[in-house]
């Protein structure tokens, strides 16, 4: 999962670095630029992590898995009854 998230982040960072500074920006040294990028990446990573954890918690608290299980059980029971009546 980390690899899936890190590849798009790496692509965005490379695009930002290769794009270069905007004309209105003053020239900065590489170390401050890399620190800025790392800070933004950490902020982005923590934001994504919070959102994913929140989504997982909501799924765990919801009764969707139970409803899905019940639905499949009901459908299976109906199919089973249909086979019994058809082939008996």
UniProtKB/Swiss-Prot annotation:
Task: Name where it mostly resides.
Answer: secreted
Instruction: Output the Pfam families linked to this UniProt entry.
Output: ApoC-I (PF04691)
The regions listed as transmembrane in this protein's record are none
GO terms for biological process?
lipid transport; lipoprotein metabolic process; negative regulation of cholesterol transport; negative regulation of lipid catabolic process; negative regulation of very-low-density lipoprotein particle clearance; triglyceride metabolic process; very-low-density lipoprotein particle clearance
The record's GO CC annotations read: high-density lipoprotein particle; very-low-density lipoprotein particle
Could you tell me one molecular function GO term of this UniProt entry?
fatty acid binding
* Subcellular location field: Secreted
The signal peptide, as residue positions, is 1-26
* The entry's keywords: Lipid transport, Secreted, Signal, Transport, VLDL
The chain's coiled-coil residues are none
Which protein family is named in the record?
Belongs to the apolipoprotein C1 family.
| Chain's role | Inhibitor of lipoprotein binding to the low density lipoprotein (LDL) receptor, LDL receptor-related protein, and very low density lipoprotein (VLDL) receptor. Associates with high density lipoproteins (HDL) and the triacylglycerol-rich lipoproteins in the plasma and makes up about 10% of the protein of the VLDL and 2% of that of HDL. Appears to interfere directly with fatty acid uptake and is also the major plasma inhibitor of cholesteryl ester transfer protein (CETP). Binds free fatty acids and reduces their intracellular esterification.
The name under which this protein is listed is Apolipoprotein C-I
Q: Please give the organism.
A: Eidolon helvum (Straw-colored fruit bat)
């Amino acid at each position: 999962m980390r690899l899936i998230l890190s590849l798009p982040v790496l692509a965005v960072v490379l695009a930002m670095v290769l794009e270069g500074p905007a004309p209105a920006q003053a020239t900065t040294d590489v170390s401050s630029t890399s620190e800025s990028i790392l800070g933004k990446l950490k902020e982005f990573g923590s934001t994504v992590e919070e959102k994913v954890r929140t989504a997982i918690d909501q799924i765990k608290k919801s009764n969707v898995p139970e409803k899905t299980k019940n639905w499949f059980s009901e459908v299976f029971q109906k199919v089973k009854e249909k086979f019994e009546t058809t082939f008996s």
